[in-house]
Amino acid sequence: MDNKKEFKIFCDESNHLSYKDNLTLCSKVMVLGALKVPSSEVIKINKTIKYLKHKYKYNKEIKWTKLNISQKYFYDELLEFFFSSVHMWFQAILIPDKKNLRHDVYNQGSHDLFYYKMYYQVLRNLIEIDTSIKIYLDYKDTRS
């Protein structure tokens, strides 16, 4: 019987597309993040998030880029839940200015190659020897 600890890693990104000068299309900041959770805790964590959404009548997708003051207490309690949990580990990479990236020099001219290299950097610190890991990547929109 295999006694490895089982974890799920949920990944998401913000503003991952190549930088464009038209600021309505793309921000210059990019973030790639991952949340590691023991498989045995996923249902409990989901229930807590659903409870908070119901409590604060928050029916939309949770998006940090769409915050407004009327949602302050929901996000305060959500952050408190995440940061007080001993069952969640978060790792992220922030690229402060995509205009400074040199894909021609470091990534064979490919923004996509850079994207996957950065995800490797995020994930490598969350994966341990002798554990079973399932990684869930967000759908990668290539057009927005």
PLM region spans:
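Phosphate-ester processing/binding pockets and catalytic centers
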Residues: 1-144
